Amino acid sequence: HDVIIPDLRGYGESSAPANDAGNTTYSKRTMAQDMADLLTALDISRADVLGHDRGARVAYRFALDHPERLGKLGIIEIVPTADFWASWTADLAMAAYHWTFLAQPAPLPERMIGADPVAYVDWTLAQWTLSKSLAAFSPAALDSYRAQALGPARVHAMCADYRAGASFD
């Protein structure tokens, strides 16, 4: 098998275009189309698709929108977005606060993260670990996460992704 591991738009080394008013620029449908376009550019007619976290949401959308291009589908560690929102409880809201925070209208979360991006990333990552520390992360991984938060276009893209999840998706 050949393995292709693209960054989703706005993440990693991908482009980070400005969002549109309808939150479609970072919708999973748009990103699934990005994946279909990538396969076309690589002259691949069908592919087995595996996705994790945000990528799993895109993989799921790819399967729905492009079934003729899908061999097998693997989804890792997600609940469908609509089910996630429908299951919202106080405990979940505290654990997954970033879903509502990042989905707030621009530029509120962008400005708040931009005030101290490294502190935001470090605190958020630590809260997701059992030990509530950064001990589970290698220095290289932390550097990568922090670098993303230091780029205003990347932060806007991250927020736009969550805005799409709270609206268009």
Question: What kind of region is each of these model predictions?
Answer:
Residues 4, 11-50, 54-169:
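Flexible "cap/lid" subdomain of the alpha/beta-hydrolase fold that forms the substrate-access gate
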